[in-house]
Amino acid sequence: MGRSLKKGPFADHHLLAKVDKLNESGEKQVIKTWSRRSTIFPEFMGHTFGVHDGRKHVPVFVTEDMVGHKLGEFAPTRTYKGHGSDKKTKR
């Protein structure tokens, strides 16, 4: 179930402040964040976020198609190595 429309989209205040500061100065640097729950706003376009996946910060470059999604959607937390192979068929 999605978020109520009357509440509007959510993004952490510290994240918005960092993006506004970088937009004013015109700098491009990686913004480290643990806020996977924040919605991507149009102001975030062109910036690279280091989204924490529980172990490291995954670089996520924000494009126009990502607006409206959450930052955590683009930094997977689980690594799938495949199912174990059947040892009987190897003989």
From Swiss-Prot:
Protein S19 forms a complex with S13 that binds strongly to the 16S ribosomal RNA. It comes from Exiguobacterium sp. (strain ATCC BAA-1283 / AT1b). GO terms for cellular component: cytoplasm; small ribosomal subunit. The keyword Oxidoreductase does not apply. Belongs to the universal ribosomal protein uS19 family. This is Small ribosomal subunit protein uS19. The keyword Transmembrane does not apply. NCBIfam families: rpsS_bact. Keywords: Ribonucleoprotein, Ribosomal protein, RNA-binding, rRNA-binding. GO terms for biological process: ribosomal small subunit assembly; translation. PROSITE patterns: RIBOSOMAL_S19. One of its GO terms (molecular function) is rRNA binding.
